[in-house]
Amino acid sequence: MKPAGATLNLLTLDIEDWRQLIRLRFTGEVCSPGREVVGETNALLQAMADLNVHATFFVLANVAVTFPELVRLIHQQGHEIASHGYSHERIYRQKPEQFRAETRKAKSLLEDITGAPVLGYRAAEFSITAQSWWALDVLSEEGFAYDSSVFPIAGRRYGVPNALLAPNRIHTRSGNAIWEFPLTAVELWKHRLPVGGGGYFRLTPYGLTRLALQRVNQQGRPAVVYLHPYEFAEEKLEIALPRLSLRQRLILVRYSWLHNFGRRRLCARFRRLLGEFGFLSVRDWLHKKGDSL
C-alpha cells in the first residue's frame, strides 16, 4: 500500500532486443530486432495497466523502425516515448558529428511515429561520462528537455562519481541548459551503491531495494527505476554465436548468466514495487514541477 503523500518516483523502460545487442557486441553484426521484444513489452504494458501506472519508454530507434506499431501502442496507452538513440553505440565511442546525426535521426523517427514531441534521451549503457560530457550540449541543441544517462557512481564502464544524486538542471560548457535525471544510487559508508534498476534490481533482495528506495524518498528525491523488456522474457535468454574465441565465449556465458539471474521472480517483484511506491513518467514529473516543456 502506497502511503498518502508519498514521493512520486520515475519509472523508465529501455526498449531494446537482447539478442540483437549481443550479436552487435560480440560479432559487430547489425541485424533487426526479434519479435520477442513485442511480447515482452506487452507484458510490461499489461502490468502497468493493471496498476494504473505510466512510465517513460526510452525506445531504441532500430526497434521503432521494425515495430512502429509497438511504439504507437505504448504512446496510445498514455506512456511517454523518449529516445534511446539509434544503434546502441556508446557515446564515448562516437564523434560529436556522428552522435548529433544519429540522435537527430532517432528523434525525428519517433516523433513521426507518434505525432508527439520527444523530450527525453537515455544513452546506450549510460555512456554520458566525463569523457562524453559534450553530449549534453548536443542534446540541448537538438531540442531535448532532459537526459537520463548519468549514473552517479564510480563504475567500470560508466559512471560520473561526483555527479549530483537528485534531478538537477545542468548548465553545459557551451552555456546551454538541460535537465538531468541520474539513475538512482545511495550513499553508504562514503560509497555510492546503485539500486533499483536492471541487474541491480534483480540481484538485490527485494527488502534491501525497498529500504534503499525509502531512504531515497526520505531525502526528498525521486528514485529513477529502469528495466528492460527482455528481463521479463518467459524463455531463457541464450544465443549461439559462431566463430567466437575462447575468451569471448566465456564472456558470453557470464553475460547470459547475469541477464538470466532473478528473472523468474521479476514480474512478481515488479508488480510489488508498483504497488508499494508511487510512479510516473519523467514528462509528468516535470509537468507537476511546473516546468514548461
Which residues fall in each region the model found?
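Short, glycine/acidic-enriched loop or turn micro-motifs at the edges of active sites
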Residues: D17, S87, E231
